[in-house]
Design a protein with these regions (language model features):
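DPxDG-like acidic metal-binding loop motif
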Residues: 54-112
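An extended, acidic
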Residues: 36, 123-190
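General beta-strand structural signal in soluble alpha/beta enzymes
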Residues: 42-46, 62, 71, 162-165, ...
Length: 190
């Protein structure tokens, strides 16, 4: 897609966020693959909302493009995410995946299995102190600085605070030690 095509606004998705053409194209491709491989599932997607029979035991939660703003502005930090669970409460996670569309990296985690990056085991960072930590923060959490002095204090203690704009990818980076932590105080992640 060229820049104009991918940034074309298509309306507001079921999650309440702006839906761009790149979001919808990614969503359609992901849903097609899911329907081919898990035909009897219930899909919850950021753009389309709920698809399938509610009586289906397996639920698949997808965010076709996590970091849409980055994607439409050619900032190469965005991903596609999928979570597969039994039931609707997400307390029995079967598997999760984050696909970095720019590096072709696939972060996977399954029930009772070691998390992997491109099929190789990953581990969290060994950093133990904030003064040497690289911690990412949801940029919307910065709006809470005036309301929450703890966040301000924490940011002053962190050696390298970062804001990347793709929460799923940032959490995957924590899982493999690229980041030492991720902070979100907004309670808006889905």
């Amino acid at each position: 897609l060229n820049n104009d095509d991918k940034s074309e606004k298509l309306g507001v998705g079921k999650s309440g966020d702006q839906t761009y053409k790149i979001d919808k194209l990614a969503e359609n491709a992901i849903i097609d693959v899911i329907k081919d491989n898990i035909p009897d599932c219930y899909i919850i997607s950021e753009e389309a909302g709920n698809l399938g029979k509610e009586s289906n035991e397996i639920t698949v939660l997808i965010d076709p493009i996590d970091g849409s703003t980055n994607a439409i502005h050619n900032i190469p930090i965005f991903s596609s995410t999928i979570l597969i669970a039994k039931g609707r409460r997400f307390n029995e996670i079967i598997s999760t995946g984050v696909y970095d569309l720019n590096t072709d990296e696939i972060f996977l985690s399954s029930e009772n299995k070691i998390p992997t990056l491109n099929e190789k085991q990953i581990n969290v960072s060994s950093t133990e102190t904030l003064d040497s930590a690289i911690i990412s923060i949801n940029p919307r959490a910065l709006n809470n600085l005036k309301k929450n002095s703890n966040i301000s204090h924490l940011l002053n203690e962190i050696r390298y605070p970062r804001c990347f704009g793709s929460a799923a990818l940032e959490i995957a980076y924590v899982a493999n030690g690229r980041l030492d932590g991720f902070i979100d105080t907004t309670n808006t992640l889905r």
